[in-house]
Every structure is written in structure tokens, then in C-alpha cells.
Curated annotation (Swiss-Prot):
Glycan-linked positions: N20, N61, N99, N116, N124, N176, N333, N348, N375
Record's protein name: Vanin-like protein 2
Expression (tissue specificity): Expressed in third instar larvae.
Source organism phylogeny: Eukaryota, Metazoa, Ecdysozoa, Arthropoda, Hexapoda
Organism listed in the record: Drosophila melanogaster
Active-site residues annotated for this sequence: E72, K167, C199
Amino acid sequence: MAKNYWGFFLFCLALGLMLNLSQQASLFKRDFYTAGVVEFEPSNELSDNLAGYLEIIQSQNATSTDIIVFPESTLNSAGSTTFVPNPEDQINPCLSDPNATYYEEFLVTLSCAARNASKYIVINLTEKQKCEDIPEDTRPCASNGLNVFNTNVVFDRQGVVVSRYRKVHLYGEPKNSTFLPELSTFETDFGVTFGHFICFDILFYTPAHQLIVEQGITDFVYPAMWFSQLPFLTVNGIFSSKAVQIQLGWSYANNVNLLAAGASDPIVGNSGSGIYHGRSGSLRSVMRQESGERSIYVARVPKYRAKRRMKRDLKRQVATSSSFNIKRDYLENFTSEELKIDAGKIGNLSQNLCHGGFCCHFDLAWRSLGKPSRNTSHYSYRVGIYEGWRNEKRLDVNYIRNCGVFTCSGNSIDDCGQLLPDIQRPLVTFTHVEIRVTYPQSREFLLFPDTLLDNLLPLEPKQFEWSQKRISEESHQVRFALRKSLEVKHLLTFGIYGNYYNNECTFGVGTAEEQLECGYKNPKI
């Protein structure tokens, strides 16, 4: 009897292993995976946020997902920090610390939730670590002996912590940065390797762009609490940014998959989540304007099968809705010119505009929508260009070369880069928009399309034309235009965002000797 029992037990065990292996093989061979990104309105109570996370993980809408990504800073705070396992130790908090004697209870609970749902779960939290655990970091430590990090944590389907990333570029946050920047990736059972970073990191070479250039990563998870700026840095936008605006532009320029989860509090300027498939654009995206929400957005994401070329030779040193709060770019530093729009008439502009030695050529055509009615006002447009450092107090800086068309609520540059009142309406329909720029070559840089409509979402790739060609060792020719026959009447921003990071090894920058050291044969003085 006992012999039959053990035989049956071993048979069931073997059958279970075979079914599991078969399922993994099927997931690996599929040409897509199913992802969910969460737009989440946080509260001040950890217990309420945790309950909201669990409700989403267990929801019907999340059933088909392989991976779920939650936003930045929507779970715990400095008053409820937790230790986080080192991924190298392959620790499962749900099994190793079920009573939460070392890790905080919410971390254990989410480990169990990932295990019970059999999904990869990406969260962002406020982490604590003992300073003594990093003896190589000789920087001063807090009096309590702890470092505090803004950290992504990834659980696999069993609840094991398989990856951890600590934010490099803090956005004015009273937290620590790591002694050396981290590059974090994790592999999945569906055959995709993800890289990850957090919010403000997207504007810098390390780690976001570096993972693409030096490791060939094609898929990214991206928790964020983005504070939008006009006109290019809404999540989707050009000179200031809205979350979705920058998300789509970054995914498009790098031709990678991006799973972006955003905090949802439009009153303070937080919103913007989406799933993006490189040059194909948005698979799902949302930009809340009136009120926050707690929702999951799901899409099937096509896999990139071809391996990317990697650069191994780089040596790195260390809405128009008044209820949406948005920051403003420093447009007074731009060279700009107002479009002369006559009511009821057709207009056009063909002009070069320069800021210092950086120039852009604009070709625009528009059709007036008629004379303004007595009880409404209309926004105007300017073309603008800027080359220089993007500076905000107490933040990491980067060097940008931007040019584009953007809206204003009046005739002065001081009236630009602000959310427009609901009563303002578009005065023109653009029938042609084209920008041509020659950008200098650099060791590290990223050029991407930056657009925004009055619903705070960007134009999709099917609505525009983009080309970037290397025309010499020193320069790239970029052309960005509306699709032929397409007309747009709700345009807030249309431009090219040139991010040159630290501007090192850029052609024409520095002495002749420095340019020769960067590999340029004919340096420009």
C-alpha cells in the first residue's frame, strides 16, 4: 500500500513538473507578452495604498498579465521604510519571513501576492539599508546609521526578489544616491530581459540610455511620479514635458518597449501611464486631467527577437485643463518668434531660426478657423529654439538642443509654456509642419520627436514623419514633419528634443586637442 502511494505521489510530481516546463516553453515561444501598467492615486496611509495594490493584482482586468508595473512613490514613505533583499541571494520574503520579523509586512504581503497570482510584479518603495553594509562608501552616514533609497523591487512569479534598482537621479528628494550608479536588469520566463529605471532617470544617459547602448536591452519597466512641464517635458511633450509625451518620444527614438506606470494626482501635476512599442507608438496610454484614479491598463506587447548591436568601446565614469498643475520651461532663454496669424486667412512660414551657433529650419502652413467670437479667446503660436544647459536648482543637469512650435496664451514669450484656460480655443488648423535640423555628433546623445495635443496626449507615429541620417562624422540631419494630407487643429507642441546629457565629446565643443581625443579627424574650433 505504501509502495503504491509513493509511486502515485512521484507520478503526480513528475506530471506537474512536465506541465510546468511545457507552460514555460509555450510562454517563451510566444511572439508577445501581456503587460499591465498601473495609474495609481496614492493616499497618506500605507495600509490603504497596499490594499489598492492588492485589489489591482487580484482584479479581473489583471488576469491575463504576465507582468504588472506600479508607479513611483505610491506605496510607503520615509516613516515606513523597509529592508530589501539582495537579488543575488534569491530571497522569497513570503516564504523566508512570513511573520515579517525582518522585512516590513507590506513587502512580505506583496511577495505573497506575486506568488499567489503567479505574475511578475514591479513596485517602487522607500528602502532603508545599513551604512555598514557598504564599506566602500566612505561618504558621511546619517546619525541613525541608515541610507534611504528610492528603489524599484521586482518579484518573480514565485515571489522571489529577482531585481532591485536604486534611483540615480533624484528629483529634489531627501534620499541617498548609491556610491556608484546601478545598472539593473532581470530575465523572465517568457523570454524577455527587462531593464529598469525611475522617473527623472529618463533624461540621462546612465542608466536608461546606457542599458540600450551597452547591453542591448529592448524592454523596460518605468515607475514614475512625473511633474509635467510645458511645452517640452510633459510626459509626452516637447520643450516642457508631460509624462506620456516623454514616454512615447523616448520609446520611439530608441525603438524599445516601455512599460510606464505613473502616479495619478493631476492637481499637483502627476499623471501619465502607457505601454509603448517603439516605432509603432502607444499600445495603451492615459493622461488624467481632472482627478486621479487607481486603474490598470493592459496590452499585448510584441517581442523584439533580433539582437541589438552594442557599443563595447564606451568607457564610462562614474491640457488645456486648469485643474492639471504643470511646470513651465525656461522659455525666456529661447530665441523665438510669434507666428503672424490673420483671422480668416491662410498663412505660412519658411524660416531659419538660430540660438548661438545652433539653427533650425521651419516650414509651416496653416488655415485660420475664422474670427474669434466675442466671449472666447484663442491661443497663439511661436517657433522657438534653445541650446544650453537645462538647469533646475538642486537637480542633476543636462545639455539640450531643442527647437519647435508651441502655444502661448498671449503675444509675449511670458505667455507661453503654461496650461491654457478651458475657454481658449485653437485659432488655426496646421496643414503642414516641418522642421529640419543639423545636429552635431556626440559620444552620448538622444534625439526624439516631442509633440502634444490639447488632450495632453502626443501624436502617434502614424501621424508624423521622422528621419535621422548621419551625413558625416560630425553631424546628423533630422527631419520631423506632419504626415502629408494630415491636418491638426489642437496642437500644443511640435518639436525635436535633443538631449546631449553632459555634452562630452560633442563635435565642435572644446579645444582641438579634446576633439581629436574624442576621435574627430577634423576638429571644429
